[in-house]
């Protein structure tokens, strides 16, 4: 049974690279809080009726990012939500503003080796359909890590602990910091 103390918490947004565990950790966190959980990538697919790889193929990354910003604006306007975002959400200034000003942002920092382990066979990740996925992950982290850090209220390292433990850790950090 979620605590009354949780009622005062703002929305919680999970950011980080692909393979960080945002969706898995987010589901556990929402369960702990008794809140709705959404994944922005899944929501984009639901609303468009198209897969992310298809959107990337037909509209390119710019088209996808435009759709992502519209969906993020809507989702971050809701209440009592735990939201897992796509890995590139922070590349758009409007998205960073929505996240930072409309809730508590938690960056799930994940080393490239662990990202690769978790995403190696996933064909639904258009940015990894390259000859050297490990190098692509390194390049993306180099570009995006400063943006994740800029938008984050809290940083959690995901290389230790199961998803449920990470969700509990996030909750403890938010409650102890007074981010609510």
UniProtKB/Swiss-Prot annotation:
Its cofactor is Mg(2+). Mg(2+) binds at residue 23. Substrate binds at residues 41, 65, 87, 144. One of its GO terms (cellular component) is cytosol. Keywords: Amino-acid biosynthesis, Aromatic amino acid biosynthesis, ATP-binding, Cytoplasm, Kinase, Magnesium, Metal-binding, Nucleotide-binding, Transferase. One of its GO terms (molecular function) is shikimate kinase activity. Coiled coil: none annotated. ATP binds at residues 19-24, 125. Pfam families: SKI (PF01202). It catalyses: shikimate + ATP = 3-phosphoshikimate + ADP + H(+). Its main location: cytoplasm. Pathway: Metabolic intermediate biosynthesis; chorismate biosynthesis; chorismate from D-erythrose 4-phosphate and phosphoenolpyruvate: step 5/7. It comes from the Bacteria. Binds 1 Mg(2+) ion per subunit. It is found in: Cytoplasm. Its EC number is 2.7.1.71. Signal peptide: none annotated. GO terms for biological process: amino acid biosynthetic process; aromatic amino acid family biosynthetic process; chorismate biosynthetic process. Belongs to the shikimate kinase family. Monomer. Catalyzes the specific phosphorylation of the 3-hydroxyl group of shikimic acid using ATP as a cosubstrate. This is Shikimate kinase. The lineage of its organism: Bacteria, Pseudomonadati, Pseudomonadota, Gammaproteobacteria, Moraxellales.
């Amino acid at each position: 049974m979620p605590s009354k103390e949780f009622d005062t918490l703002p929305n919680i947004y999970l950011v980080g690279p692909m393979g960080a565990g945002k969706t898995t950790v987010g589901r556990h966190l929402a369960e702990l809080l008794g809140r709705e959980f959404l994944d922005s990538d899944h929501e984009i697919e639901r609303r468009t009726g198209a897969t992310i790889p298809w959107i990337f193929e037909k509209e390119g990354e710019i088209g996808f990012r435009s759709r992502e910003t519209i969906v993020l604006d809507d989702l971050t306007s809701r209440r009592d939500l735990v939201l897992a975002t796509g890995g590139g959400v922070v590349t758009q200034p409007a998205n960073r503003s929505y996240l930072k000003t409309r809730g508590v942002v938690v960056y799930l920092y994940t080393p490239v080796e662990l990202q690769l382990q978790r995403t190696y066979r996933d064909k639904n990740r258009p940015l990894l359909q390259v000859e050297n996925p490990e190098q692509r992950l390194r390049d993306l982290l180099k570009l995006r890590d400063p943006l994740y850090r800029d938008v984050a209220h809290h940083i959690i390292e995901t290389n230790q602990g199961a998803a449920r433990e990470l969700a509990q850790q996030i909750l403890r950090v938010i409650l102890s910091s007074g981010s609510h």
